[in-house]
């Protein structure tokens, strides 16, 4: 029976879904810390990142689906068999991480971390002026999936957004100006939020 090694965290309902769709496969679930050579040697499909040094031992591997956007170490010479397909998770984290970044900005601008401490100590204490996102300048360094989604959210809240990317590319409507990394020294003093 063909084997699928799953190293990404899956809920019980996800296991049932996978096993229902892949009835011809034997599923092996391991955490990244539990993976051994014997887990990978006969796996034809691996879902999730495994230690790169174990990949060459997976001689039957046909498909490796990473749970990260980065894949550089897996593309090095001698890591994958020539006919193994590799897929990464580019685009999978933009929404969640950009929302997390927005929460961090709001926490700092509104001093929520200070008010949380006060609340725990049963204090009602003014922590001074809080700042709005509206009319601020946000400098987004990196306009991949995460940076672009964050820039779009900041723009929607009224911030003027300046983007920095490695290579010249078209400017999205939600970004006022797209610059390159060598412009950082000029841009940083203008930014309220980086």
Map each language-model feature to its residues.
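Short gly/ser/thr-rich secondary-structure transition/capping motifs
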Residues: 25-32, 44-49, 118-126, 173-181
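An N-terminal-biased, well-structured beta-alpha scaffold segment characteristic
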Residues: 1-85, 189
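Rossmann-like dinucleotide/phosphate-binding beta-alpha-beta segment
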Residues: 129-193
């Amino acid at each position: 029976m063909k084997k699928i090694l799953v190293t990404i965290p899956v809920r019980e309902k996800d296991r049932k879904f996978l096993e229902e769709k892949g009835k011809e496969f034997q599923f092996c679930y391991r955490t990244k810390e539990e993976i051994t050579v014997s887990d990978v040697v006969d796996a034809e499909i691996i879902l999730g990142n495994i230690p790169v040094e174990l990949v060459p031992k997976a001689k039957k591997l046909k498909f490796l689906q990473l749970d990260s956007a980065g894949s550089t170490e897996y593309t090095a010479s001698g890591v994958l068999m020539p006919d193994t397909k590799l897929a990464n998770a580019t685009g999978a984290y933009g929404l969640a991480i950009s929302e997390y970044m927005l929460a961090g900005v709001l926490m700092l601008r509104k001093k929520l971390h200070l008010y949380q401490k006060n609340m725990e100590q049963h204090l009602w204490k003014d922590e001074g002026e809080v700042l709005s996102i509206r009319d601020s300048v946000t400098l987004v360094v990196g306009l991949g999936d995460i940076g672009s989604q964050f820039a779009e959210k900041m723009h929607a809240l009224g911030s003027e957004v300046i983007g920095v990317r490695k290579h010249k590319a078209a400017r999205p409507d939600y970004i006022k100006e797209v610059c390159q990394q060598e412009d950082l020294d000029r841009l940083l003093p203008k930014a309220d939020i980086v």
